Amino acid sequence: MFKGSMPALVTPMKDGAVDFATLEALVEWQIAEGSHGLVPVGTTGESPTLSHEEHEAVVAKVIEVAAGRVPVIAGAGSNNTVEAVRFVRHAKDAGADGALVVTPYYNKPTQGGMIAHYTALAEAADIPIVIYNIPGRSVVDMTPATMAALAALPTIVGVKDATGDLARVSQTRMACGPEFIQLSGEDATALGFNAHGGVGCISVTANVAPALCAQFQEATLAGDFATALALQDKLMPLHEAIFVEPGLVGAKYALSLLGKCSEDVRLPLLGLSDGTKVLIKDAMIHAGILG
């Protein structure tokens, strides 16, 4: 259903507004470069600073432009269950292939609260739901046992795991079964993630180096870890440089060097420091994507 390299798409901005023409061009470029799916309006898509109307318009535009050529997993998370229900229903109505739903952040629900939250979403719309577990941002960590309870629901199909804990992949497979889709949420450890049984990555770096990230994923899924390791070595400096400051800011700067997108981000995020810009430019040259 979902596998391979799936960029967590940036949301282009121009003069403070969403730049839909550039978004359309980015989607076309991503598909032409070999990305296996698209994930709009996650954290990298600046979801916290988009209005509901902008959020839904971005999702609809990506689905429209993709036109069924690759799956679209729409960002639909919130720490307010009622709001998440709205986003999941919109994803379904807009024609998304799935919805990515982050664990509720800031209000710190219990494991039981998370089960109730995702159960409400599964009951609200008949659409495949991918759990997004990122305790570094949400301050809650969904356990494999909780995930197994949710995996029993027919529309809870997988997880984007950004714990950085490679042993978790095996633990989740043991708890949820081999059909439960596991996607990495951390570029730097995606090689090991797939070696443990993962099947893809929802990637920030793929915004900037989509062809290399797609080739990397294809190599790991074919069991060709020699090729994957060579690609990892090309990409690793870029993985690291993009995240010296907030990853979406780094990705937008890198895209600006490629002429694909402006650097514009919304407050409270700021543009990159000069030192980080140098690191990203050097990493792009190392990867062979910038002359």
Swiss-Prot record:
Q: Spell out the residues of the site Part of a proton relay during catalysis.
A: T43, Y106
Identify the main location.
cytoplasm
Residues the entry annotates as binding pyruvate: T44, I202
Q: Where is the active site?
A: Y132, K160
Instruction: Supply the Gene3D superfamilies for this chain.
Output: Aldolase class I
Q: Which HAMAP family match?
A: DapA
Q: Spell out the PANTHER family in the cross-references.
A: 4-HYDROXY-2-OXOGLUTARATE ALDOLASE, MITOCHONDRIAL, DIHYDRODIPICOLINATE SYNTHASE
What role is this protein assigned? Catalyzes the condensation of (S)-aspartate-beta-semialdehyde [(S)-ASA] and pyruvate to 4-hydroxy-tetrahydrodipicolinate (HTPA).
Q: Subunit structure, per the record?
A: Homotetramer; dimer of dimers.
Tell me the protein's name: 4-hydroxy-tetrahydrodipicolinate synthase
Q: Which organism is it from?
A: Dinoroseobacter shibae (strain DSM 16493 / NCIMB 14021 / DFL 12)
The gene coding this protein? dapA
